Amino acid sequence: TIQLSLPYRNMGLSGRVTYAFDDRYFFEGNFGYNGSERFSEKERYGFFPSAGLGYIISNEPFYPESLKKVVSKLKLKATFGLVGNDQIGAKEDRFYYRSEVNLNNGSYGYTWGNDYTGLHSVNGVSINRYANDDITWETSRKTNLGVEIGLFNDLELQVDVYRDYRYNILMSRASLPGSMGLQASIKSNLGEAISQGI
């Protein structure tokens, strides 16, 4: 289709701020404000912030020197953020807010005539995709908690617990009755998925 030959147009604005105090307290904040051509005007832009904190307890004055000989480093950290994804569906479904109509579908045409006059056929019209102004960014909410432990100034261990909750996953609606007379499947941001672990 012609839409595959068009240049892709996306916009993005991003920013970051970092702060560290006395080699003990750390903060980092990021954001992305992104626009995608794939969605309608009301859903085109998404704001995706993230933040991270770090705390090195072993650098505190109250941290015992006797413990420091064994646990030479003890750091706690946490991050939380949102990530947006506009690369959803097939590449042919580039503009979800527009219908895609096939004006030359032989499966929906008609034929007339007979063996004596000759058979004549004309291709028909079919709908491949209905316009949907409500399709939007698939979003992932990521959370991570971790600890870094240094032993004897030589060995370092890291343990992280993470949770990734994805929502607004693009899926086909399965509960529409055939009596509605729709030719193409209806897609919406219906799906959810969770992954978590250590």
Q: In which residue ranges do the predicted regions lie?
A:
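Extracellular/periplasmic, surface-exposed regions of secreted and cell-surface proteins
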Residues: 1-198
